[in-house]
């Protein structure tokens, strides 16, 4: 289990909580202080699948008052399975009546006292990092009338007091080594309740004289009033650490036997063992997450380790650090001891509770975050020092008024124009219709040229990439998101002449005050520009912020701005045949220049090959710029059928059998799943092409069979020939096209 993966899943869980609760300011602060890691989980469905919460999610939906967030669902599940079914319900009631045996001890305390329950929860015990203060890692439970039980009351002698100091347990339930964090033990059986009563009866006199230890602050949580001052707290922290260093491996069974007053009956230890087993069960589920999500990732591993194998590997890796004198040595010993005691029954129970979903495998290379200096352990020190390059932090530069004016002029021809609503609501959102999961959904007309060009690049990675899954057209969420990341990175890198790229992201806050001849549109003013000079860094950065492109709301606009800035406004203007051209034309339609910029990296105005010189007759020569090289994604146009233009071979015969189709002022995609179509002439005799149009509300797959061996005879009186067929015949002259039962698109 990689700690960085657990931390990233946890941070994604927090982001989902903040988003569902509508805490926008907190979310923005979190994004600034804890940026998303590469390949971060950005969708709720993917996060739910990663945590195996599908069953719990469905059960929650059936309740009278369903919980809104996954974090609440997990919390409810864990509390219910830690013996708190009666303590917590959907309405959030948290104050159950205490057991009879403990009520007697509780009544002896002053009514005004505020009791603090402090359970030490270290990274070693939970398997993940917690956001805690610099002086302590504790989980604080504040209660006035809840069940209170002081573990220190049942420890006798100096050695036992030393163990009590190390464990850091002062009240409420048992918190023995290896447990996740069960704060209280809920005694269900009558025999167990009697055992606890006997234990309390024997130690009740010492319970009144025992002074609670000072509480420790958890970041973001206010502590209640305590009897000891802050200075007193600092004095007590020192002995705690020294005791932890000098007392290796306290034994769980021994501590439990002391708590129960020396009674060795199994029934008295059963509640703690049950809580321990449930804690391990939940930890095993978290441990199994990254092991279940490996196949699609760029970083693959060999096999899923069993709990005992995991413990053995950790022990071997920590062998060197165990010999060093450190205040954390005891914690490390407890961690290894806790994992070594984990049996296969816990793992199998976890699998039965939350089944695997192996068809959606995805392991993320994520960012290690929120590790305090005073909390560094051998587990953190053993992380390889060679971190992936995509974890590099990239400094952004806010856009200024002058840049915004230049961009608007190159986009619209005027700084008074703005992005239309069709552009503002459009992102690269995938279709969840099962036969068309690879395709984008277009909400309204306008940015169809950008969508079709990016769609072609996504299909290239999906069908012919290194991790192509046998040309399957029904990718998982993680697969299609990964293909979108690579498509965006390739487009921007190509526009930057394979030397650099600029990624424009929205921060949600204006970076300058509009003035003069400039009209604000709410998008350009909030941009942060990130210049990246390595492709690996670009890929990691796009993966880290893919949610802005995929979920939006300005995904399509941000990509357009990024590709223009990657090419630079000056070079885009030089690519035009006429300097007054623009990238977005009338009615917010994409121009040919914008489509060419995405496909070839140059905003040329024509689709023929290379450059054509026109002699105006007076010795003046006009240069018309076309596509300079063979592209990855091709282009076919209905205008060629009407003899308005001539598409060159660079676009007609691309490296991959994917074409952007321009027909009736609309852009869509045509592709073949067999790459041999571009290299084997025998393949061109009869082959299948697939057509996708994100705007047409397409529900089913459209497969066309093209037969070039037969001859198509056009009927002069028939005006109902589908425009798509005309586009196809600009490349395969006279081919017969069969729609295979699908109604032709007219």
Curated annotation (Swiss-Prot):
Active site residues according to the UniProt entry: 448 (nucleophile), 666 (proton acceptor)
InterPro entries: MINDY-3/4_CD, MINY3/4
S-S bridge residues: none
Highest classification ranks of the organism: Eukaryota, Metazoa, Chordata, Craniata, Vertebrata
Protein name (database record): Probable ubiquitin carboxyl-terminal hydrolase MINDY-4
Keyword rRNA-binding in annotation: no
GO molecular function, a single term: cysteine-type deubiquitinase activity
Protein's job: Probable hydrolase that can remove 'Lys-48'-linked conjugated ubiquitin from proteins.
Protease recorded as keyword: yes
Species name: Xenopus tropicalis
Protein family according to the UniProt entry: Belongs to the MINDY deubiquitinase family. FAM188 subfamily.
